[in-house]
Every structure is written in C-alpha cells, then in structure tokens.
Amino acid sequence: MIRLHDTAAGELLPLSPREPGKVSMYVCGPTVYGPPHLGHGRFSLVFDVLRRYLEWSGNDVTYVSNITDIDDKILDRATREGRPWTEVTEHYEQVWWQAMDAIGVKRPDH
C-alpha cells in the first residue's frame, strides 16, 4: 500500500480510505490571473500521477479541484488591463485547461 506524508503527524502513514477501494481527493487548483508556470505543472503532475496510481491499483477515485476566480491578484490584473475581472478569469481559466490538456493531466471529476 502507498504511504503519504501526513503533515499533522509529521510522518509517513499508509493511505487508508474510509471505504475500502474508494478514494476521494481534493486538490487546490490555480488562481487564474496569468498563464500557468512550471510550479503549476509540477503540482498538477504530482497529483495526476497519484490519482492514476490509485486507479491502477483498483481504487475508485473521485478527484475534486477548484479554480480560484476572484482574488486580489486577479483584481490587480483586471485594473492594469482595463477590463472586467470576469474576462481575466475566463481567459486564463481556458489557458489553464489548454496547458493541462497539453501535458496530459486528467481533468477533475468535479
């Protein structure tokens, strides 16, 4: 079985789903105020590999992630560009998904 670092316990602990064979993952997604960078790619790939490993191991995985679409950085960019913040987030959310699709990261279930 896979072991993951538990930050609260400060140690590696075996992954033990509440319901055997079913794993739920929530991963914070990006704040979409600019194009994705290497750090975004890294966290996306790390959790994509974990998800795929868990699926390969026979688990039913539910993967949930968010897109932060309102934030000071978004509002600052909108002000600098002279356009509504909703246009900024809509544009960069599309850029985000295109980039993740390009590197083969599976999209979240929700």
Give the ranges of each region predicted by the language model.
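N-terminal Rossmann-like or analogous alpha/beta NTP/dinucleotide-binding catalytic cores
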Residues: M1-H110
